[in-house]
Amino acid sequence: MVRLLSILMLGLAVFAAASPTASDAAPEDHFRSGSRCAPVKGNCSPACGKYNFVFAGLPWNHPAIAASGFTPQQVEAGIRQDMAAIVKAGYNIKAVLFGPEDSLDFLSSELKGVDWTAVGVGFGIRGSPSPNITRRFMDIIQLYREETPRERILFNYSPVTSLWAIQQYFPLPMNCTDNMGKDL
């Protein structure tokens, strides 16, 4: 028993000695020339402002919004708050708001010319009990599969949780206060 304990202690000591420490790590050159990032730990990451996301959703003044129990003002404020939080967190975001009565060509044209990191569908479309909006949801998913086949599809669970959905798969390693994202 004493030998087993000695071997275990020796193994732990070797493991601890071989583990890298913060001072052993090679310095990372995150601050390229022309970068808006200041060389202060925690204020910037090379990934800040690099990830592009698009979310399709219902406009806040769509009749289905009122039928859902929310006011247009609540949904508008929520979407604006969510967009601002996404940009502040260091992500680029585009919201494409349209109803089932609008052509999918609108969303298709908004997808062109940008290298999207992921695409999303808002809860107003996914959570609606309307057959027309549910059909539109299926059409949006198919359009995403055809036009952005390699990008992950994200879902929020309320008008203010798109940042949460993004961070589930694309967390930024640092705070992006010195290099925020953009509203595309």
Task: List each language-model region with its residue ranges.
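Fungal secretory targeting signals
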Residues: 1-27
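Mid-chain, well-packed structural core segment of small domains
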Residues: 107-142
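Glycine- and acidic-residue-enriched helix-capping/strand-helix junction motifs
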Residues: 63-78
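N-terminal, charge-rich interaction modules
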Residues: 34-66
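Short beta->alpha junction loops
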Residues: 93-102, 154-159
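Short, electropositive alpha-helical surface patch
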Residues: 104-118, 175-184
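Ser/Thr/Gly-rich flexible loops in soluble cytosolic domains mediating phosphotransfer, phosphorylation
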Residues: 136-175
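Short helix-loop-beta junction
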Residues: 81-92
